[in-house]
């Protein structure tokens, strides 16, 4: 995987990698083959659960992120562990793992004026249903006529 391709960079030039990514890769180098395949099978089980879910439902709609924005220069919002990248992308990460098609569109603004995203997820090979819903939402929300509060972010 990516870790194997970057192993030489990690060994010779670790400063070239984002610290949070480097930590994740280094932690994964410590895992045994059995641990690795255990995680692969967990992912496959989760993918099967989603496949079953999408036999009953056409789409799943979630917030894109649990926060409206991240301060410039940070990889993770201040209220989350700076080395735990996936903890704050908990709404998008599962679908990256399973390969589900998904889209995120701006849906409104937070109290502070920062944009808020809505994620739309579909069953495999049903991107058309995502595009249809996103188009309908964009048409009725008129979100693009408003500007976010630039502020300190």
Question: Residue spans of the language-model regions?
Answer:
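Short, solvent-exposed amphipathic alpha-helical segments in soluble enzyme
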Residues: 45, 77-78, 135-136
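Short, Asp-centered acidic motifs that coordinate Mg2+ and/or phosphate
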Residues: 58-60
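Structural helix-boundary/capping segments
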Residues: 31, 37, 48-51, 56, ...
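Short, surface-exposed loop/helix-turn segments at secondary-structure junctions
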Residues: 1, 38, 69-89
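Short helix-loop capping/hinge segments that flank enzyme active sites or metal/cofactor-binding pockets
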Residues: 1-51, 63, 101-114
């Amino acid at each position: 995987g990516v870790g194997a391709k970057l192993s030489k960079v990690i060994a010779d030039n670790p400063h070239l990698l984002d610290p949070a990514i480097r930590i994740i890769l280094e932690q994964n180098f410590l895992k045994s083959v059995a641990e690795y395949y255990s995680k692969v099978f967990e992912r496959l089980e989760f993918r099967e659960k989603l496949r079953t879910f999408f036999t009953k439902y056409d789409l799943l709609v979630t917030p894109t992120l649990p926060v409206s924005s991240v301060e410039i220069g940070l990889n993770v919002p201040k209220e989350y562990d700076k080395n735990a990248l996936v903890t704050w992308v908990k709404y998008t990460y599962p679908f990256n793992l399973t390969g589900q098609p998904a889209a995120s569109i701006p849906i409104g603004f937070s109290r502070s004026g920062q944009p808020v995203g809505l994620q739309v997820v579909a069953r495999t090979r049903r991107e058309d249903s995502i595009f249809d819903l996103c188009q309908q939402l964009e048409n009725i929300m008129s979100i693009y006529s408003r500007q976010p509060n630039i502020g300190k972010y």
